[in-house]
Amino acid sequence: DAFNALFEATWLINETHGGENHARLLNYIEYAQSNDLSIGVAMTDGKGDRSKRPSQQVQPDSYVHVTERRADGIVISGVKAIITGGPYMHEFLVMPCRRMQPEDKDFAVACAVPIDAPGITIVSRPAGRPGNPAAMFSAKFAQSVAVAYFDNVFVPMERVFIDGETDEAHIMTTNYATHHRHSCIGARAGFGDLLIGAGAMIAEANGLDYEKTPHMREKMVDLIKITEGFYACGIAASTMGVHDAAGNFRPDRVYSNIGKLLLANQIYDMHRLAHDLSGGLVVALPSPDEDHNPSTAAMLSDVLRGHPDVPYQHRANVARFIEDLTASETGG
């Protein structure tokens, strides 16, 4: 998403102002691909006082900005507040998160920085819930989100893609939103598929048959409708995409944004429907420690069984899986 956004922006900079910005980006993309690097997108700034522009902030480090320009590069300072996978990336792509006016020129900066560059401090929470037996998903699959503070970090010129070009920086931000919302549709559709499958399993474990339980069937239909609805927007955005000015493919903006609006608003309905399909055990089930407690294991296995042909342990595992996805510190 970030590379796609920068592709057109740097091309436009060269077309309008001249320079080597686009060539630098292409060289960096080749470098990242050749070395199989994981690149974290450092885009969302701390933002400070939301009523003020970046250049009006009492604390200028609320936004990443250029503090010094040298012949061989730039120096940047400021905070990026939400970096997915931050601690386990090789490098950060630093990019502006909003439209910059001419007075915000120093804040219109995009560049590539190794995460161990001098002056970077990364603060993060652990990814998921490793080692937690109740975390049926996030014990193995999760993501960490980082805050990164750049304290006068030097960036060589060959890694600088945007520096003060506010109009092109705005185009980059808009393009990134389109690409990222498009890819987010696929991610959330996959999440919806997990809930649909888990909902089918928990109903069976609870002893219910969708063919004979109309109100449950309606909830499952709603869950499928929501998931496939925004996924269809993703398909439409893909098939109706166009080539941008630089010749790069861009998904359709309208369907990318409609899909993102649908999933962002209806993710809460997806959680609610998963809970309706599951029942109270999702949040009330005893700890997995009790599954092996000789004083309670046999009793729980007997009285908390649902369908007689479905073992209690399977019912418990599915319930904990849904809890992990929808009602835990990771997915709630």
Question: What is each PLM-predicted segment?
Answer:
Residues 1-39, 85, 91:
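Internal helix-loop-helix
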Residues 37-39, 72, 90-92, 107-111, ...:
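Structural beta-strand/beta-sheet cores of well-ordered domains, especially the beta-sheet scaffolds
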Residues 26-29, 51-56, 60-65:
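Beta-sandwich/jelly-roll carbohydrate-recognition scaffolds of carbohydrate-active enzymes
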Residues 191-269:
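Long, well-ordered mid-to-C-terminal structural blocks that present hydrophobic/aromatic surfaces
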Residues 36-49:
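A short, Trp-centered hydrophobic/proline-enriched beta-strand micro-motif
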Residues 79, 83-131:
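A short core secondary-structure module
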Residues 132-226:
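Glycine-rich beta->alpha junctions and the first turn(s) of the following alpha-helix
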